[in-house]
Amino acid sequence: MTRAQSGDLVAIYADESCIGNGREGDNPGGAGGLIEWLHPKSSEVTRCDYWISEPATTNNRMALRSVIEAFREISRRGNAYRVLFTSDSKYIVEGMNSWVASWIARGWKRKGGAIENLELWKQAVTAVSQHEVQWRWVRGHNGQPQNEYANFLATRAAAEQSNSGGLRESEFDSWVPEQKEGTVDLKNMAPFPDLQSFQPSKRAWTT
């Protein structure tokens, strides 16, 4: 990421996990993601990982934290990027594509009552605000390598209650062959997105 320039396209694959989600008691959770950046001259893909955890949480809360952590990390570079954010969480994708604009128009209120995880939604909007983002949903546990890897990072973080402490050099390239030797049926790796096909979501809010 150190070579990424303003306007470059960044691909983020994020996932979340919560052990015992919805049950009574403290349910530990984690979130993780794979961040990819394509060097425009060499076509080399640079990959970084991040992961976080909470001792008592929910799936939706960790999905929001996966967004916040990813965008805070790339924003530390001081550049505004075009970002393709891929998640299997409809809560995130539909929220960012549809719900947030109406909530903000109503003063962060919704017709049906209180907004779940309101403060995290506000943090997510702030973290995202300087970037152009396309929010893309992908079916979970469907063999898409980058998404499966994000799931691996999230579930490991939840189980170990570990945190990456920022971006780490990715282990994706060594993880993929290990899965192919096991029982996981991985599909072909998603190619780095084409800038010409990038379609950012309409940003109907300000911060």
Task: For the regions a language model picked out, list residue spans one by one.
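Generic alpha-helical secondary-structure signal
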Residues: 69, 153, 175-178
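Stable alpha-helical structural segments in soluble proteins, enriched in small hydrophobic residues
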Residues: 62, 150-157
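Conserved "HGTGT" condensation-loop signature of ketosynthase/thiolase-family condensing enzymes
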Residues: 33, 125, 170, 174-175
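RNase H catalytic domain
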Residues: 16-24, 28, 68-149, 186
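Acidic, His- and aromatic-enriched active-site or binding-groove loops in soluble protein domains
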Residues: 114, 155-172
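Short, conserved alpha-helix that lines the donor NDP-sugar binding/gating region
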Residues: 63, 67
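RNase H-like nuclease fold core
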Residues: 1-61, 72-73, 186-207
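Low-complexity, rRNA-contacting terminal tracts
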Residues: 172-185
